[in-house]
Curated annotation (Swiss-Prot):
Name by which UniProt lists this protein: Histone H3 type 2
Modified residues (N6-methyllysine): K5, K10, K28, K36, K37
Modification type Phosphoserine: residues: S11
InterPro entries referenced in this protein's UniProt entry, alphabetically: Histone-fold, Histone_H2A/H2B/H3, Histone_H3/CENP-A
Assembly mode: The nucleosome is a histone octamer containing two molecules each of H2A, H2B, H3 and H4 assembled in one H3-H4 heterotetramer and two H2A-H2B heterodimers. The octamer wraps approximately 147 bp of DNA.
Gene: ch3-II
Keywords: Acetylation, Chromosome, DNA-binding, Methylation, Nucleosome core, Nucleus, Phosphoprotein
Amino acid sequence: MARTKQTARKSTGGKAPRKQLATKAARKTPATGGVKKPHRYRPGTVALREIRKYQKSTELLIRKLPFQRLVREIAQDFKTDLRFQSQAVLALQEAAEAYLVGLFEDTNLCAIHAKRVTIMPKDIQLARRIRGERA
């Protein structure tokens, strides 16, 4: 690790910094055998990048086959041996994803209204109640 010049800082009256007693050789890992630790982004950076990525895109985010299995499983409760056109399943998936995106937008607004940045189940419940979906 390269040494950098320290800039003077105004004292805030706390404890004085401890003196470094370890020698330079003991502190530094050997240049040839040192293992470089992987680069990590600061918390939130990757999340914001993902938000921008998914807001730009229009592709479906739920995998097609698991969604199709879910649709068939739910349809079994109403009538057995139902068949679906592939376009019908895609239309259902498009509608389901649009509904979920809208619900999460409203949920986020509920969390922000409560002066939080983390969404919670109570935010989803409030959003659905305001929408009139759940009395």
